[in-house]
């Protein structure tokens, strides 16, 4: 009488893919079904028949999984499956399930979504139009299943913004009142603890005992009622999606039904901006419902439920242990009891899974934002450190003249100077002639100064000349490192300096200080500084040092007798007024013909202005004026003079005073009078003695008529 329902080879595979105990789609089983149907000519027809039988199941999960399998078959099995899905049998089964009163709303929404998608897929084939007819009929009979159309993006008006601001102020006021109410209940103790633990606001409003409450407590209880009544983004923090939303423009947020979206701000009149799973965009308000913030009672109940679920963890672990150790055929009452207890917490466990899954997504999103912000900061920091700001040099172009009209630090570059007198040609090191000052025991030749003259004074090793009457003219030409022959006609012994082994460069090192007339030799016939105007012949080649390289040098400024010798005559008084006299001995000049003044320009300053050549000027005590007359030719042409070294000075340094005629004897001995007997001792020099004289004479001796400085013509320069 009754025929058994026919079965197909695909019933088992589809039943496995749509098991009611599944918590999510089993895509492995679904793809296995698709592979079998694609490889079988009758697979599409038999698979659709198995799907129709699974749609008749009373479990909503089975119905949802069956619709998902049908969607997978339509996308993977081609044209034969499209014809079977658009058949009259399958479409009638869908409409029947959607129109039943006991069908779950999610199943109805899934059927509507599937028929719409298949209608769009089959619209190019006229033979498959039955699917579009089924979709149209389902939409007419169940208008509530169709998601609403997205509203227009209208800009917010001033009224809307004012309303949002008012709701924000109300929410802030309610929050402050709630905080005040909590502060008032805190010191009340156990007697006032019934207020926060009471059930709900409507129950409190209907309680007659509220008449005895004070006005402050009644006012504090009022804010509990309007909670969650906000309608703007300023007062709503979360919304739940009612439908699936697929973005149609850039900047819109995609979400599925049931997703909870965090509200950020209002963008348009019916569009808000929200954040979901790390993405931000706008969404329509008619696709979501507002969620009120949980009340303290709700939070307490949620915490209690969570504690109950975690308390069952021991039973779950015990059940798993018994199931893994006991045999399959053995029935145990303990296992059945534990299974019932653990099954009771399944709905609560699902809610907790959803809750913590959402929290996990929120924390993951926050972590991604933090990592991105940190990377941006590190990138900016590296960029700023790898490209430091360049200094602006223009701000140093002009500096104030801090020291009396000194030139600016960055003068304009011009053509090089062509005047050779302004440059130092290559020659001896500048330190060859260090500055020197006269000895404190030095006395000026000429005896007592005149009534109009002032005695010189000495400051820190340098002499400051006195300013008295006019000074006589003297000529101070640049010196020459060559030798000269004294009037006796005998060449003195040559002394070696530290640069005796190498000749000076051919360029004139003294050309920067004078412009003499036609000169002979390498250094231009310099004039002797300690005489009035005396030309010196120039040696055309360097002379070796007869004393050896280890011979000691004379002092830089003072002769040997000034440091080590004993004065041979009483010195003349330094000033007419009398005072402390300092001994000093100098050698007289005899049998010297006074030379004529030379027409040679004196040095204009430089490295010789304060060095060995200033001894003659120091003898006067004042800076001598510049001579204008021409110098006579040298008395003995071709003669050479000794280049006296400077003791303790740099290489090549020489003292000009030791090359004067007064410092050399007539026979030019290799070692001066009183000098050392060995090269290691300090040399001493004797005074000049003319031929026929028995010994040196003091400058003040009146018995020397041939003394140059005692002659009437010879004292004119002093």
Swiss-Prot record:
Q: Which InterPro entries match?
A: ENTH_VHS, GAT_dom, SH3-like_dom_sf, SH3_domain, STAM, UIM_dom, VHS_dom
Q: Does the keyword Transport apply?
A: yes
Transport found in the keyword field: yes
List the CDD domains. Answer: GAT_Hse1, SH3_GRB2_like_C, VHS_HSE1
Its GO biological process annotations read: protein transport to vacuole involved in ubiquitin-dependent protein catabolic process via the multivesicular body sorting pathway
> Bias regions of kind Polar residues — which residues?
521-534
Specify the UIM domain's residue ranges.
163-182
- Name the segments for region: Disordered: 142-164, 178-230, 384-718
Print the keywords alphabetically: Endosome, Membrane, Protein transport, SH3 domain, Transport
Hey, what's the signal peptide range on this chain? none
Q: Which GO terms describe its molecular function?
A: phosphatidylinositol binding; ubiquitin binding
- Identify one Gene Ontology CC term for this UniProt entry: ESCRT-0 complex
VHS domain sequence ranges: 17-146
Where, subcellularly, is it found? Endosome membrane
Compositional bias (Low complexity): 187-202, 210-221, 509-520, 581-604, 665-680, 689-706
Q: Topologically, how does it sit relative to the membrane?
A: Peripheral membrane protein
Identify one Pfam family in the record: GAT
Q: Which residues form the SH3 domain?
A: 234-293
* Ranges of Pro residues composition bias in the record: 408-438, 624-637
Known function? Component of the ESCRT-0 complex which is the sorting receptor for ubiquitinated cargo proteins at the multivesicular body (MVB).
Sequence similarity: Belongs to the STAM family.
Q: How does it assemble?
A: Component of the ESCRT-0 complex composed of HSE1 and VPS27.
- Protein name as annotated: Class E vacuolar protein-sorting machinery protein HSE1
- State the organism named in the record: Pyricularia oryzae (strain 70-15 / ATCC MYA-4617 / FGSC 8958)
């Amino acid at each position: 009488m009754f025929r058994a329902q026919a079965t197909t080879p695909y019933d088992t595979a589809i039943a496995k893919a749509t098991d009611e105990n599944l918590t999510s789609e089993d895509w492995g089983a679904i793809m296995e079904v698709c592979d079998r149907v694609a490889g079988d000519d009758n697979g599409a027809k038999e698979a659709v028949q198995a799907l129709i039988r699974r749609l008749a199941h009373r479990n909503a999960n089975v119905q949802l999984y069956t619709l998902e399998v049908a969607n997978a078959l339509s996308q993977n099995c081609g044209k034969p499956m499209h014809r079977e899905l658009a058949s009259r049998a399958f479409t009638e089964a869908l409409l029947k399930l959607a129109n039943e009163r006991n069908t779950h709303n999610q199943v109805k929404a899934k059927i509507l979504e599937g028929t719409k998608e298949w209608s769009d897929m089959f619209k190019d084939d006229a033979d498959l139009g039955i699917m579009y007819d089924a979709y149209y009929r389902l939409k007419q009979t169940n208008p509530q299943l169709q998601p609403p159309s997205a509203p227009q993006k209208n800009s917010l008006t001033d009224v809307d913004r004012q309303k949002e601001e008012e709701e924000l102020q109300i929410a802030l006021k309610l929050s402050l009142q709630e905080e005040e109410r909590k502060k008032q209940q805190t010191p009340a103790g156990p007697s006032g603890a019934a207020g926060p633990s009471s059930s709900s606001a409507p129950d409190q409003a209907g309680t007659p005992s509220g008449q005895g409450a004070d006005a402050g407590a009644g006012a504090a209880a009022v804010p509990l009622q309007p909670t969650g009544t906000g309608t703007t983004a300023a007062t709503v923090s979360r919304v739940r999606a009612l439908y699936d939303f697929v973005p149609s423009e850039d900047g819109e947020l995609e979400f599925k039904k049931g997703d909870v979206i965090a509200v950020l701000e209002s963008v348009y009149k019916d569009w808000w901006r929200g954040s979901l799973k790390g993405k931000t965009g706008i969404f329509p308000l008619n696709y979501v419902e507002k969620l009120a913030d949980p009340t303290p009672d709700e939070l307490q109940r949620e915490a209690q439920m969570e504690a109950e679920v975690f308390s069952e963890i021991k039973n779950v672990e015990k059940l798993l242990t018994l199931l893994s150790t006991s045999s399959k055929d053995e029935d145990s009452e303990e296992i059945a009891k534990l299974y019932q207890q653990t099954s009771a917490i399944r709905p609560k466990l699902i809610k907790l899974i959803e809750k913590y899954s959402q929290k996990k997504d929120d924390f993951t999103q926050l972590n991604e934002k933090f990592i991105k912000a940190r990377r941006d900061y590190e990138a900016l920091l590296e960029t700023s450190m790898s490209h430091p700001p360049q200094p602006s040099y223009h701000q140093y172009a002009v500096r104030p003249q801090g020291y009396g009209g000194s030139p600016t630090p960055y003068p304009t570059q011009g053509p090089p100077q062509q005047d050779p007198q302004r440059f130092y040609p290559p020659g001896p090191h500048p330190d060859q002639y260090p500055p020197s000052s006269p000895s404190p025991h030095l006395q000026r030749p000429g005896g007592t100064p005149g009534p109009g003259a002032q005695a010189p004074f000495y400051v820190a090793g340098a002499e400051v000349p006195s300013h008295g009457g006019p000074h006589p003219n003297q000529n101070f030409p640049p010196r020459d490192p060559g030798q000269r022959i004294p009037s006796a006609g005998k060449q003195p012994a040559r002394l070696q300096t530290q640069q005796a082994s190498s000749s000076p460069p051919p360029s004139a090192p003294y050309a920067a200080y004078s412009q003499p007339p036609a000169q002979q030799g390498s250094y231009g016939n310099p004039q002797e500084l300690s005489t009035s105007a005396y030309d010196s012949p120039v040696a055309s080649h360097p002379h070796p040092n007869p004393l050896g390289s280890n011979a000691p040098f004379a002092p830089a400024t003072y002769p040997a007798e000034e440091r080590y010798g004993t004065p041979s005559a009483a010195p003349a008084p330094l000033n007419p007024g009398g005072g402390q006299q300092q001994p000093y001995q100098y050698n007289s000049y005899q049998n010297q013909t006074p030379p004529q003044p030379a027409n040679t320009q004196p040095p204009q300053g430089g490295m010789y202005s304060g060095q060995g050549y200033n001894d003659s000027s120091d003898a006067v005590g004042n800076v001598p004026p510049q001579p204008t007359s021409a110098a006579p030719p040298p008395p003995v042409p071709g003669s050479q003079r000794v280049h006296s070294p400077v003791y303790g000075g740099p290489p090549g340094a020489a003292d000009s005073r030791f090359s004067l005629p007064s410092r050399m004897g007539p026979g030019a001995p290799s070692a001066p009078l009183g000098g050392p007997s060995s090269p290691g001792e300090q040399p001493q020099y004797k005074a000049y003695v003319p031929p026929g004289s028995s010994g040196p004479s003091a400058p003040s001796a009146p018995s020397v008529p041939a003394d140059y400085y005692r002659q009437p013509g010879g004292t004119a320069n002093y």
